[in-house]
A protein has these predicted regions:
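Non-catalytic pre-domain segments flanking phosphatase-related domains
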Residues: 1-17, 165-175
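Mg2+-dependent phosphoryl-transfer enzymes with acidic/Ser/Thr/Gly-rich catalytic loops
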Residues: 34-38, 68, 74-76, 80-82, ...
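Short coil/turn segments at beta-strand junctions that form active-site/ligand-binding loops
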Residues: 11-13, 56, 104-105
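Asp-based phosphoryl-transfer active-site loop
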Residues: 9-28, 119, 152
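Basic, amphipathic juxtamembrane/active-site segments
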Residues: 6, 27-49, 129
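Fold-independent oxyanion-binding glycine-rich loops
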Residues: 19-20, 25-26, 64, 111-112, ...
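Substrate-recognition element of Asp-dependent hydrolases with the DxDx(T/V) motif
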Residues: 48-72, 83, 119
Length: 175
């Protein structure tokens, strides 16, 4: 994981996240009235903001569609939100084209088999410790923290550290 992952993360200009199991713990809360609730970790959100503040675009690709995800993306300033993505690889290609990037300049963090088509195409693949072995073994970086419990933040900081930008990123909070 170490050196190769850092080398791959160094060139990332776009980081894309799955939602369920990555930005959340993967559990869905459904009410009788049909409302869907998800819990997001504020530290993950801060990590996403740090990426954006340091010139790294952030996107979300998720197979499900949810107003909750739309709201959270808006709160974090994520404009590259694609929900209801049955074919994540084609959505990934569309995002790359829209940002005028090639696959080696994009990272992706996923947690399940549906994420494999993107994980094997991107320049920097990240996952969570609870992901199936088929996903973990194809990831360049597997977070120590669980999905929805700081895994995304850990990956954001890893990218910034790989780009020698982490100290600069947190510097504004030390003033």
């Amino acid at each position: 994981m170490g050196g190769n992952a850092a080398e791959r993360a160094r060139g990332i200009k776009l980081m894309i996240f799955d939602v369920d199991g990555v930005l959340t713990d993967g559990r869905l809360y459904l009410s009788d009235s049909g409302e869907e609730m998800k819990a997001f970790n504020t530290r993950d959100g801060q990590g996403i903001k740090l990426l954006r503040e340091n010139g790294i675009a952030v996107g979300v690709i998720t197979a499900r569609s949810s107003r909750v995800v739309e709201r959270r993306a808006r709160e974090l300033g994520i404009e590259l939100l694609r929900q209801g993505a049955a074919d994540k690889a084609s959505v990934f290609a569309e995002l790359l084209s829209g940002q005028n990037l090639n696959a080696s300049e994009a990272g992706y963090m996923g947690d399940d088999l549906a994420d494999l088509p993107v994980l094997i195409r991107c320049g920097f693949a990240a996952s969570v410790p609870s992901a199936p072995e088929a996903v973990r073994t194809r990831a360049h970086y597997v977070a120590r923290a669980a999905g929805g419990e700081g895994a995304a933040r850990e990956v954001c900081e890893f990218i910034l550290k790989s780009q020698n930008a982490l100290e600069h990123a947190i510097g504004g909070y030390l003033a």
